[in-house]
């Protein structure tokens, strides 16, 4: 069987030119049927081309279905002009074949409308669950971003980086362990309570910093309860710097 890549379609141009001129439509079909008329023309066309073109029209039709639809419609139009056949069931079949081959790509590429998505009762719970999941993920990331960039976390991290005890335990270049650190705990400055911890790493080891502070009295005075660094089972206390650094506003 000859592949479609090696098939030269220009070899059939004289055949279609002959069809247009009417040289191949010399014998009328014995029955007034569009399908038999097309078959008669196909047979006569094969006889007309068998000496000059080794590939018959029937094998060419099997190679390319899309081109077959267009050629059959062309035969149908020529038969109607030559013999005056009426459009019957075969004509409707050829028309459907031609429309299916031409309009398939447009139907596949069409995006569904918003009403079609929302009208399906099965898709509504899935879309609602996906929306809730996306909203929850964005909310958690936003809260963690706020904790990471809060003045409490930045001041405590500054104290750890400049602490002599922390440098002896972790080494130099102390920073957050991950590019986007996870800061669990409570950071409620308005309610007067802070209890957070985050992971840090240096050139020698890594550890966990825990900070806890609470506000007492009507003057809104913050009291630091805990500020420690734990690494490899060893816990050290981070010294307090300037007193105003522990008064959170």
UniProtKB/Swiss-Prot annotation:
The keyword Mitochondrion applies. It is a single-pass membrane protein. One of its GO terms (cellular component) is mitochondrial inner membrane. The chain crosses the membrane at residues 124-144. Residues 145-249 are mitochondrial intermembrane. Pfam families: Coa1. Residues 1-123 are mitochondrial matrix. Keywords: Membrane, Mitochondrion, Mitochondrion inner membrane, Transmembrane, Transmembrane helix. GO terms for biological process: mitochondrial cytochrome c oxidase assembly. Required for efficient assembly of cytochrome c oxidase in the mitochondrial inner membrane. Involved in a step coupling MSS51-dependent cotranslational insertion of COX1 to the addition of its heme A and copper B cofactors. PANTHER family: CYTOCHROME C OXIDASE ASSEMBLY FACTOR 1 (PTHR28523:SF1). Belongs to the COA1 family. This is Cytochrome c oxidase assembly factor 1.
